[in-house]
Structure formats: structure tokens, C-alpha cells
């Protein structure tokens, strides 16, 4: 799984605030001057930065569905409405589905549930992220769907490798795929999307929260750290809360 980050700009006394406030996202690319060595140094450092692991799903109007593992999920705001963000490297079928439907479901995972890390690992790999269907004209795999698709073409042998058995997947009232045994699901509508270099940053409003079958109190978070899926545990002394 690649580690993904977006640029963050903060105000500075050396620049007028109104310039930063009205700086268009389309201009971000011109500020990319990182050398190859700098990119590698950044990548190595970020491997020591623990990131939350979620699975995001969406769908197209024709009934096709898409999903992937993401490590860029971030809660943005709580009030007046919960808002979250995540980013996806493009090109991506999942990003295309989100842009078409303007909806996404974020599945929170637990290290206490073994199949959650299995889901995340398999959906992070390109060959397992999709259920390939044969394109008879080009004789190649070209369709990327999660189980439950309305597509009726003949599947290739690679579809047998799909990590999500249909019993794991249900549909939301909007028709998006849900992983029924997730720790929790955030049903969201997209409110903003911005292309930042080779990623798209999505900002979404959380319309409803659905708790999974596992008790939250007995579940440990699932994070990605140093190229491995890891559990979380409190340090001693336990910090009850951290708020800026």
C-alpha cells in the first residue's frame, strides 16, 4: 500500500492572508520542486508515521461498484456537521465512481477482527481490488466491480481471487456496497474535491453513522505502520483526551 499525503498550507506573516485564502488548488502543482532524494527521504520518514486504515466504497449509476483500501482518512470537523476527508491516487476507478455518484461509504476497521486486515491487505493490491470481467473485444481485464454488480458478462479466472465473498457485502439504501462486519460505517456525500498533483482530495459530509456488530469498547484500531498492519494499545499513563 502506498502512503499518501496531500499538501497543507498555513498562513504566514510573510504573505498576505488574502493571497493564501484565494489561492486556487489548480496552482498547487507549480510548487512541486522536490528532488528524487527528497521524495525518498519523505517516503522513509512517513513509514514511521502510523496511519488509520479504512475501506471506501462507491458505485456508478449503471450498477457497477468499486472499492479500495485507504490510509489517508482524516476527521476534519465535528460541528455543526461531521466532515471527513481522504485522498486517492489517480487514475482510479474508485475515484471515478465517487465523482460520478458524489457518495462514498467509509468502513472503519478493527485489528481485533482478523478478516478486517485481510480485507485491507487484499483490497490494497491492484489485482485483488477488483473483480475483473473479460472484455471479449480486447481479450483483457477491463471492468472493476465489487461483488453484487449487475454486470452479467463472463468472469475471468482472476475473479476467483476476489477477497470479498458476496456474503460479506450488502447494499445501502443508496445502492452502495457495505461490508456488513465492519467496526462502523460512515455514509457520506461529497461536498468538495480537488486535484493535487497525482491525487484527488475528497471532502465529505457524514450524513449518518452505522455501528457494526463488534462492541467498540473491546475493539482495537487498525493502523498501517512501517509497511505492516498493526494494532493500537494505550501507553501508560493513559491520556484521557487530546484536544487542540
Curated annotation (Swiss-Prot):
Pfam families given for it? Flavin_Reduct (PF01613)
Spell out the residue ranges making up region: Disordered.
Answer: 131-158
What EC number(s) does the entry state?
1.5.1.36
Q: What is its main location?
A: mitochondrion
Q: Which domain of life is it from?
A: Eukaryota
Give this protein's Gene Ontology molecular function annotations.
flavin reductase (NADH) activity; FMN binding; riboflavin reductase (NADPH) activity
Q: Does the keyword Transcription apply?
A: no
Recorded phenotype for the gene knockout or disruption:
Strongly decreases cellular coenzyme Q levels. Increases cellular sulfide levels. Decreases coq4 protein level; addition of p-hydroxybenzoic acid restores protein level. Sensitive to hydrogen peroxide, copper(II) sulfate, and mildly sensitive to thermal stress. Decreases growth on minimal medium.
Q: Which cellular components does GO assign to this protein?
A: mitochondrion
Q: Which reaction does it catalyse?
A: a reduced flavin + NAD(+) = an oxidized flavin + NADH + 2 H(+)
Alphabetic keyword roster: Mitochondrion, Oxidoreductase, Ubiquinone biosynthesis
- Residue ranges, compositional bias (Polar residues): 132-158
Q: Per its UniProt record, what SMART domains does this chain match? A: Flavin_Reduct
Any Gene Ontology biological process: ubiquinone biosynthetic process
Q: Where in the cell is it found?
A: Mitochondrion
UniProt cross-references to InterPro entries, sorted A to Z: Flavin_Rdtase-like_dom (IPR002563), NADH-dep_flavin_reductase (IPR050268), Split_barrel_FMN-bd (IPR012349)
> According to its UniProt entry, what is the function of this protein?
NADH-dependent flavin reductase that acts in the coenzyme Q biosynthetic pathway. Required for synthesis of the p-hydroxybenzoic acid (PHB) precursor to form a quinone backbone.
Q: What is this protein called?
A: NAD reductase coq12
- State the species of origin: Schizosaccharomyces pombe (strain 972 / ATCC 24843) (Fission yeast)
Taxonomic lineage is:
Eukaryota, Fungi, Dikarya, Ascomycota, Taphrinomycotina
Q: What's the name of its gene?
A: coq12
Amino acid at each position: 500500500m502506498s502512503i499518501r499525503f496531500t499538501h497543507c498550507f498555513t498562513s504566514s506573516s510573510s504573505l498576505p492572508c488574502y493571497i493564501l485564502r484565494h489561492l486556487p488548488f489548480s496552482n498547487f502543482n507549480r510548487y512541486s520542486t522536490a528532488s528524487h532524494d527528497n521524495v525518498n527521504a519523505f517516503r522513509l520518514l512517513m513509514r514511521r508515521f502510523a496511519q488509520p486504515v479504512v475501506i471506501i466504497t462507491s458505485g456508478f449509476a449503471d450498477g457497477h461498484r468499486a472499492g479500495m483500501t485507504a490510509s489517508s482518512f482524516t476527521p476534519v470537523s465535528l460541528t455543526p456537521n461531521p466532515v471527513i476527508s481522504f485522498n486517492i491516487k489517480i487514475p482510479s476507478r474508485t475515484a471515478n465512481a465517487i465523482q460520478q455518484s458524489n457518495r462514498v461509504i467509509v468502513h472503519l476497521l478493527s485489528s481485533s477482527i482478523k478478516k478486517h486486515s485481510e480485507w485491507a491487505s487484499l483490497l490494497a493490491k491492484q489485482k485483488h481490488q477488483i473483480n475483473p470481467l473479460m472484455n471479449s473485444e480486447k481479450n483483457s481485464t477491463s471492468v472493476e466491480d465489487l461483488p453484487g454488480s449487475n454486470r452479467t458478462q463472463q468472469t475471468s479466472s482472476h475473479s476467483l481471487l476476489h477477497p470479498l465473498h458476496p456474503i460479506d457485502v450488502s447494499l445501502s439504501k443508496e445502492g452502495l456496497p457495505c461490508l456488513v462486519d465492519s467496526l462502523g460505517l460512515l455514509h457520506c456525500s461529497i461536498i468538495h474535491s480537488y486535484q493535487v498533483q497525482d491525487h484527488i482530495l475528497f471532502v465529505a459530509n457524514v450524513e449518518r453513522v452505522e455501528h457494526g456488530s463488534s462492541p467498540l469498547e473491546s475493539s482495537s484500531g487498525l493502523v498501517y505502520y512501517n509497511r505492516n498492519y498493526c494494532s493500537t494499545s494505550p501507553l501508560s499513563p493513559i491520556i484521557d483526551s487530546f484536544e487542540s
